Amino acid sequence: MNSENIIEQAFGKLQIYIKPKEKVQAENLLHRLRSRQLYRELVKYAKEDHLINASVYQTHHGYSLHGKISSRNVELANEDLSMCVELIDEKEKLEAFCIKHADLLRGKMIVFKPVEFWQIK
């Protein structure tokens, strides 16, 4: 395939590292009764904000923000082991997402990387 068949577009990728046990602060009684996991809320908000892609990846071994090394046991989930919420879109839209949801993202490890989005003709 030659490059004439590929349309390139500059995008960005955010990687937000959080722990699976992190919850969204309850705003009312209904939310207190039904706990909301932060990673699910971030994906929901990404969809509402029309970002092109949102994915969640579970890690198996590692650490984040200088914390202790954790591993995932086959039989038991480790609520302290980091997971990654990955968002892809234009840099400006990712910046707007971070500003809009700053209360949820404050204190989290967030990595931005420029990427190319390819469409095949």
Where are these regions (language model features)?
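Positively charged, small/polar-rich N-terminal and surface patches that mediate targeting and assembly
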Residues: M1-K121
